[in-house]
């Protein structure tokens, strides 16, 4: 690590701490040449492979933007969306992969969004899973009833 002050090619780590979100490490360093101290932040890179084959860096903001559309008009705050995006990123990073398919991000969003707001979940799932008919919605609603409310599976919508 080059010293940003004197450009010496080496530095000594004085202190390392995990960031609040647990996704990066903050290191306090000291240059052995000039003695000045500086901080660095280290994160593991994560790339997304889109359906078209294009590879781009992972972006929490894109998750928030996509989910915000599904939450429009719902009692979901920006803070809720930020927490959801953080949980999704943690889930993805826990796989240890440096590249992930865009489809896998959507799969990681669905359970978190279902916990946050069921209506927003249905909206997001209808686009993400390409619902084609009312039966697709009925099936998703039925699944929500069974999983979250303990109702029998044969209840009509």
Curated annotation (Swiss-Prot):
Signal peptide (residue range): none
Instruction: Name the cofactor(s) required for activity, per the record.
Output: Zn(2+)
Protein origin, superkingdom = Bacteria
Q: Which Pfam families match?
A: ATP-cone, Zn_ribbon_NrdR
Keywords annotated in UniProt:
ATP-binding, DNA-binding, Metal-binding, Nucleotide-binding, Repressor, Transcription, Transcription regulation, Zinc, Zinc-finger
Q: Is Signal a UniProt keyword of this protein?
A: no
Instruction: Quote one Gene Ontology molecular function term.
Output: ATP binding
As to how many cofactors bind and how, the note says: Binds 1 zinc ion.
Q: Which residues form the ATP-cone domain?
A: 46-136
Query: PROSITE patterns in the record, alphabetically?
Result: ATP_CONE
Record GO biological process: negative regulation of DNA-templated transcription
Q: Which InterPro entries match?
A: ATP-cone_dom (IPR005144), NrdR-like_N (IPR055173), RNR_NrdR-like (IPR003796)
ZnF unnamed residues are 3-34
UniProt function note: Negatively regulates transcription of bacterial ribonucleotide reductase nrd genes and operons by binding to NrdR-boxes.
Instruction: State the PANTHER family in the record.
Output: TRANSCRIPTIONAL REPRESSOR NRDR (PTHR30455:SF2)
Protein family (similarity comment): Belongs to the NrdR family.
Its protein name is Transcriptional repressor NrdR
Q: Which organism is it from?
A: Leifsonia xyli subsp. xyli (strain CTCB07)
Q: Which gene encodes it?
A: nrdR
């Amino acid at each position: 690590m080059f010293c940003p002050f004197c450009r010496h090619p080496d530095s000594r780590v004085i202190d390392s701490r995990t960031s609040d979100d647990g996704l990066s490490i903050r290191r306090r360093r000291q240059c052995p040449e000039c003695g000045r101290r500086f901080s660095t932040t280290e994160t593991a890179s994560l790339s997304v492979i889109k359906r078209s084959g294009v590879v781009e860096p992972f972006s929490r903001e894109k998750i928030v933007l996509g989910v915000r559309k599904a939450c429009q008009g719902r009692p979901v705050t920006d803070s809720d969306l930020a927490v959801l995006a953080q949980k999704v990123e943690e889930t993805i990073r826990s796989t240890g992969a440096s590249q992930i398919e865009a489809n896998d991000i959507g799969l990681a969003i669905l359970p978190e969004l279902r916990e946050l707001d069921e209506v927003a979940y249905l909206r997001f799932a209808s686009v993400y899973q390409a619902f084609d008919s009312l039966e697709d919605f009925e099936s998703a609603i039925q699944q929500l009833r069974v999983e979250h409310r303990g109702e029998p599976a044969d209840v009509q919508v």
